[in-house]
Structures are given as C-alpha cells and as structure tokens.
Amino acid sequence: MLQLFIYSPGLGQPTMDPGCLAALIYCALAVPKDEIEILRTANSGMSPTHKLPALWDGHVWIGSLKNILIYLKQKGYNLDNFDAKQLANVMAFTSLLEGSVNDLWLLEAFVNEENFVEAIRPAWSKALKFPHNYLTPNALQRQAKERLAQTLGIRDEEVSYEASRMPISHKWTNATRHRQALLRTQARRIRISSLARQVYGSLESLISDSKFIFGEKPTSLDCLFYAYLSFHAFTNELPQATLRPCLQFNSPKLYAYLKSLRETWFSDDSNILSPLSIKVQPENLLTIARLAWNNVTAKANDTRKSITKFSVPPERKLLWARNGFFIFASAFSFVWFVISNGIVVIETEDDEASFEEVDDAKESIQEKEIDETTESKATHDSSETSSSKELPKEEEKESSSFDLQPLSAQDLLFSGFAEDEIMDEEFGYDDDDDEEFDLDDLDDLEEEIV
C-alpha cells in the first residue's frame, strides 16, 4: 500500500502546503482508495529532499511533487492523455505554477512580516505538535526567503523592517519611522500586484468554457492549478491580502474556474477526500530527535553559505594581492641571499656520498700511518734489544782480554795521568792551566801507601 505524507490542514485548506495539496488531489483522483493511505505529519526527515510531500511505496521513498507524479504515472495511476500540443502547454504552465505563482504566495505569506506574525505562524503552530509548532514555521520562512532571493532578487533587509515589528511606543509617536514602514509596505504591494497581474493573465489564457482545462475530465494540470492558486483566492486570514483582490478584479475568469473546482472537489455533497484513509502519524522521541538534528544541520548549512557568500571589496582584494606579492618577494630574496653567500649549504645525496668517501679515505690514510709508526717503533725496539745484547758480549771480551795485575801507587797515579791525556785527546780537554803536581806530595803519598 502507498503512503502519502503531507502537512496538517490549515488556512481553510486540507493541507497548508501547495505541493502537498496537489499531491493529495492527484492521489484522490487517480489512485484507488484501498491502495493509498494519507498520513499527516510535520516530520519531513523521511523525505529524500527533506521536504513534504513524500511517498512511501513499501520499499523506497519518493520526495517532491514532481517525482511523485512521475512515479504514480509509471505505476499506471495516470490522469493524463495529452497530445503533443497539450503536453507542451502542460510543461509550460506547470513551470509557471511551480515558479512564479508559488513565489507570489511565499512573498505574501512568509516574507510579509505582518502576515506571517499574525496569520501564518499561528496557523502552523495550531496545526502542529510540539516541537514542530516552534521549529517548522521559522524553517519555512527561512526557506522562502532563500528561494525569493534567488528567483526575485529580494534581499532580507528589504523586508526585515515592518510597521508591525515596531515597539508600540514608537509605532504611532515616531511619524518618520512609521511613514518609512508604510512606504516600504506599499512599494511591496505594488510590486506584488504588478507581477500577479502578469502571471494571472497568462494562466487565464488557458481557461476555456469547459469544466476542466482540457475537457470534461480532470488532469494533473487541473490539480496543480487549484493547489497553487487556491491559496491566492481563498485565504481570508491575511491582514494584508494583496493577491486575492488582484485575482478577483483582474482575472475573473480564472477566479470562477477555481471556485468551480472547489465546489466539485471539496463541497459537502461531493468531497473527493472523504473515501480516503487519513491518519495522523504518531510522534516519538526518535522523530523529535531527528527533527532537532535536521534543524541543527540546517543552521550549520546556513552559516556555511553565509560565509561562502561573504563578498570582499575589490580595493581590499587589490591590497591583499599587493601585500602578498611583497611578502613573497621579500622571502624569496632573503632565501636567495642566504644560499648564494654560503650561509646555509644545501646538501644533496651525491654530496653526502662524496663526503663519506673523503672521510673513508682519511680514515684509511690515518690507519696506514698508524701501522707504519707501529712497525717502525717495533723495528727500533728490536734493534735496541739486539744492540743491548751485543754490548755485554763485547764488554765481556774486553774485560776478558785484560788481565788484572797489582799496581803500585805510582802506577795508579800515572795511569790516571794517562787517562787524562786520553780524555784530552778525545774531548780536547786542556789542563795546562792547572797547577803543577808537587813531587814532594807524591813522595808523601808513596810513604803513606807503604
């Protein structure tokens, strides 16, 4: 069984959203009553587009009115049988209804602050449960302002100051502010009326004398006509209504067509919704948490969009570019000065390899020198040891060659002189200056020895 999820009723309509109303009317006319169930909800989190209407076929979710109509036609629930010319008209007027006609309603209902505060927000809050009654109206107003900023170029600051939002103490006493608010409101009404007359005139050209647009049977285009234009024609709660009088006086044929559809589909005698199973989707903590999370993510996306849309004056961009160029040039010149003067040396892998080879060569040379010194020292030590061994042998030979004989005192004495002469000859020692040896002393010495 198919399940269609739509917003709750309000503002004199079965549902307070034009897209939901179009899907509801089409399903009531095309789908058998035992094959579809209508669920009223404020939770749009189940929809792939996060907007209602949404359709669940038991396996997959379908979001947005356009996708729902295409899916139902593919399943065989088709109200249309157009030829080529009719199909071209349907596509053109469908685009007009979903575009300009819907923009006019959003402009009057959600952007006009007095209408929103006094009529639209209370109606939504009354139809929805907590916490949807606080979150959904403001979310719809935010979406409407974003859409109109793209389609009609209306900025938020153009409609943010209204007479209804003035403090009571200033509303009537401050004549200047009150006059400015009234002028803005009047200018917006003129703009809405001008755009509405053009749109209504184009739509009225398609209305014929037949009961429906293309004959005696309703089509998807009839559903769209009534869904989008009924809010213009039959909403009585707005304190500043501009679209309804404009439609009544400037396009009476179109207004009569809408009244005829209302009597055919929603009169007390023949209501196409009465056979349908319409229920209210139960709310639980999970759906409330999902809604809260969706609102948090929506605000985060809005903040991200506002940051990305931040515009910088051209003069400031030029200043930033100039400063950036000077900073880059200064940094480049400093780096070039440091590298060119050798203050910082950038080593590559080849340089590191060459340095390693040089270090290895130095180490090998040092090792060779150490080996040579150790070898020379070893040879020197060995030679000294051999010489030291030979010297005692020679001394022994010399000592053995001389026989010790007893010497007299005179021999000992003169032997000393002989040694002195030898020392004088070898070392050039001259003792001529010494005192002459006294012979008397020599005789005394001999006597003492004897």
UniProtKB/Swiss-Prot annotation:
CDD domains: GST_C_Metaxin, GST_N_Metaxin1_like. Residues 374-383, 390-400 have a biased composition (Basic and acidic residues). Belongs to the metaxin family. PANTHER family: FAILED AXON CONNECTIONS-RELATED, METAXIN RELATED. Keywords: Cytoplasm, Membrane, Mitochondrion, Mitochondrion outer membrane, Nucleus, Protein transport, Transport. This is Metaxin-like protein C409.19c. The keyword Membrane applies. It comes from Schizosaccharomyces pombe (strain 972 / ATCC 24843). GO terms for biological process: mitochondrion organization; protein insertion into mitochondrial outer membrane. GO terms for cellular component: cytoplasm; nucleus; SAM complex. May be involved in transport of proteins into the mitochondrion. InterPro entries: Glutathione-S-Trfase_C_sf, Metaxin_GST, Mito_Protein_Transport_Metaxin, Sam37/metaxin_N. Residues 355-407, 423-450 are annotated as: Disordered. It holds the Pfam family Tom37. It is found in: Cytoplasm; Nucleus; Mitochondrion outer membrane.
